[in-house]
């Protein structure tokens, strides 16, 4: 039996809708599709592993059904969470972030179940001592990744210790029972597997509670003294994520200071945490623990509304997936960015921007009439038009050809020089790093190296071939 995957489900190609009824229809259709897929998978698991315990997969599936029913019943009241007021439309991106999170939680339990029982089905002879050592190693690894912060409520940290102590005691009792009763090897194997599943569930359930708490805004801390030299400062920053079943540390103990007016590049392999780092310093997300101070403001204390206001006042963001409003023309999309700048004198001339990115002759076109590279150019112009204090970009030149990449990068550097803007971008292109005042190398959620460049190159000085 093959593994389950979210990609087996079909999603709409559209990204936005202005019709609340359409939002409900899309939600209902997708959740029904997911339910049928998961129900079929659960039946197949029962058929293939009828003698195995299906407690966790079945329980998680039932939780999903209950959540689905509640979600659809309450959608008329809760649909505002998917509504972008500024653009007057519902976002399918926001909708499917929520729906997929629920479906993935069930899929994770199905796949974990498959992993466990495929291992059990291996032909090698079961050895109790080896299995117990593997069990200890597994739980040791779980404990190393436990979420922690000094801010955590005492009852959650104490619960972790209680679970560890109870598990050790119960394992000793189980091994004594096996030594006394000497059951067959296959029963010993089942007893240990059941023990692992049960205690893993308890441990991760508490971890999910901890991470959920950590990802909420903190109580307001003491006022931060602005650092005139460094516009961004991170101290011991962690970011944990959860799908409702398991947890993962994406950033691990990040310490970082970024100077104002610098051009900064973040490099790292896929899954290294570089986009998460960008999201946290740009106010797109909060850290789970530690301190993130941007322009003198402590980000971990901000609620969602305050983060939105922070981005509106100080940040321009160039999204990897463009993020253009589909019912607005090229020019109108750029004007949206410009209008976020409350001081009209600070706005950058839209005609000059469109000319610079080669889109002035297409300014009356809608996004669906443009290529991917053209949409990215509009996204870049929109971020620049506001003339924000900080500009962040997630692969901002990823969809551009070589010639336009160079044109856009020249525009980046010109705006930085003229307006003293601080710019931070994530990229896979090592050549772009030669333009940076500072290069941050990220791997496995940690900063592996910082490379300051006292004499950054100009675009025309780089061999782009």
UniProtKB/Swiss-Prot annotation:
The keyword Zinc does not apply. The keyword ATP-binding applies. ATP binds at residues 268-275. Keywords: ATP-binding, Nucleotide-binding, Transport. GO terms for molecular function: ATP binding; ATP hydrolysis activity. CDD domains: ABC_MJ0796_LolCDE_FtsE (cd03255). It comes from the Bacteria. Residues 232-465 form the ABC transporter domain. Gene3D superfamilies: P-loop containing nucleotide triphosphate hydrolases. Belongs to the ABC transporter superfamily. This is Putative ABC transporter ATP-binding protein MG065 homolog. It comes from Mycoplasma pneumoniae (strain ATCC 29342 / M129 / Subtype 1).
